[in-house]
Amino acid sequence: TDNLTITPAPGMNSEQSQDIQLSALKLADEIGLIGAVELLVDANDYKKLIDVNWLAPNSGYWSQIGSKTNFYEQNLRAVLDLPLGSTEINSQFTLTGRLSTDPTSDDYRPYLHLMARNPELKFNQVSKEVGITGDNLEELLTEVIHTQQYYSGEINE
């Protein structure tokens, strides 16, 4: 869905991943990029570039919980001409999902229920996202989708 990200993309093999990384490095070199950039590629044709995001990335939250060094820290390191940090991931998968709610609602009750149900869930109050890391994709999907549905009021348990 548009409200869910899975990192790394399921089904992507190491050759495809390496091709995308090399393309990104080539683009960065061609334009003299200093800092970080997010490249969005087509899920069906990974060589088809959909968007280049120079500012706050759409998928930046996943890196805060799923990567040794997150997007924002990497950007700061690059701008300050410091060595970049490890891009190693913490688990096999990181899932994030946007949360839909009334902007005037009290988030305390949903957070209390969801955090008690699964302490592994991580919430970003600013971007209204939930995230979780692990190795079982099906279980992670179930957790994130349940959280989104509960938070939005679609379900009440």
Tell where the protein language model's regions lie, with residue ranges:
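Internal nucleotide-binding/catalytic subdomain
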Residues: 1-45
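Residues in flexible loops and secondary-structure boundaries
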Residues: 1-3, 12, 60, 70, ...
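A short, polar/proline- and glycine-enriched secondary-structure boundary/capping micro-motif
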Residues: 2-5, 16-17, 59-64, 140-142
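Short, low-complexity, polar/charged sequence segments that are solvent-exposed and flexible
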Residues: 10-14, 58, 68-72, 114-121, ...
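Active-site "cap" helix and flanking loop/linker of ATP-utilizing ligase/carboxylase catalytic domains
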Residues: 19-38, 53-102
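Contiguous C-terminal substrate-recognition/catalytic subdomains in enzyme active sites
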Residues: 45-46, 65
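Protein kinase-like catalytic core scaffold
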Residues: 48-51
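Peripheral (often C-terminal) accessory segments that flank ATP-dependent C-N-forming ligase machineries
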Residues: 77-157
